[in-house]
Amino acid sequence: MSGYFSGFSLNKITDSIATAAHKTQDTLNNALANANVNLNDPQTRLSIKSRTRFVQESLGTVSDISKLPPQYQFLEKKSDSLEKVCKRILLVSKTFEVEGYDYPPNLTESISDWWSLNKDGWFGSKKSESSTKKKGSNHDDAFLPRSFAQAISKAAVDCECEFQNLEHNEKAELKKKKESIKTAQTTEAQGADHNEEDEEDEEDEEDDEDLSNLIKVFDSWSTCYKNIDEGKAEMDSMMVKEFNKKLETLINQDFKKVHDLRKKVEESRLKFDTMRYEVKAKEAELEAKKAEATGEAHSKDVSAKDISANTTTSFDETPSTEDEKPKSEGAEEESKKEANEPTVDDVADRKEDLKSNKVNDEPPIEESEDNKLLEKLEDEFVSNTTAAVETMEEITDSSEILGLIKLFQNFQLVYFRQCVQEVEANLKVLNGLEI
């Protein structure tokens, strides 16, 4: 057991704990120092106070809130509604990016096509005529059709190949039959069977014409929907590149810019309201101090007047008749001294004048730093609101949405016109055939 704990040292553990504690303390001190530096910044303090005011406004404890212009409020609602509309349209038009959106995968058809494409490679060395026909028909042999038109075109090609194989087999059998007849030994048998051979040739020609007409029907049908499928693929590509891309740009860039500007307006309003509240609080505090100083000066003035009145009455009561003559002789001298010496009333008046001068000497509220910052925040609030209004007016203009919908309808019109032209051409071919 001693071998397992040979490297154990209590001093190492103590040193490690002490080192970790020192690092943690240093990190904490640095964080506090950075926090103190940031808290000394006026903008940082204002940001913290504005966040506090935001919470107070959310809770409904603050009622003095700056109101935004009615035009701004209406544009906000219109912008939000238009953004919802664009997102709703994009949710549907994203379907054009999904291949085969108008023809859901059919498991039975897919397995059948996959089997027909691979069975020749598994069980035989020769490829069928149908596969050769499909390759020569410039037809896309995808595992899953990308559209309903392509599915019909593919089915028509398969039908055409089926009848072509049938026609090919019939011709091969007729050829063998004719060769067997030509190798007949007797001329009499050949002469007797001549009329029967002519009748069989006429019937075969009628059957060949019927098969060829069926082949033409499915070939025309396949070509019609092959062209329709190509037109649809082009329309889908234009929808994705033009319509969807413009909608995504409108949502992800233009409306995002509007949200950023509205956020700036809200932040500047919060800062302005916070600073306005601070300035009002300081004004109220200063007015309270002025009223308190005026009240103290007035009370001191009243007390000083009471003291002077009491002293004069005491002087009038103390002198006797015996001392009237010497006092009358020195009355002039005392009156001169009293005229030169300041009275209690004079001292109180001078103190009040000094206090009023000190109050008047203080810088006015309008010229203080807080009011300068308040004016700056007000200008910032107004400029941000103006910029947001201009941007929202530009984005919410109906011409933008009108242009997008016209673009959508033009793509649809081109595709549907092509569909009509292809179907009319196919019907013209079908009407010209007699089966």
UniProtKB/Swiss-Prot annotation:
Residues 174-210, 290-372 are annotated as: Disordered. It is found in: Cytoplasm. Residues 195-210 have a biased composition (Acidic residues). InterPro entries: AH/BAR_dom_sf (IPR027267), BAR_dom-cont (IPR018859). GO terms for cellular component: cytoplasm. The keyword Ion transport does not apply. The keyword ATP-binding does not apply. Residues 308-318 have a biased composition (Polar residues). The modification Phosphoserine is found at S47. Gene3D superfamilies: Arfaptin homology (AH) domain/BAR domain. SUPFAM superfamilies: BAR/IMD domain-like. It holds the Pfam family BAR_2. Keywords: Cytoplasm, Phosphoprotein. It comes from the Eukaryota. Residues 290-304, 322-340, 347-361 have a biased composition (Basic and acidic residues). This is Uncharacterized protein YPR148C.
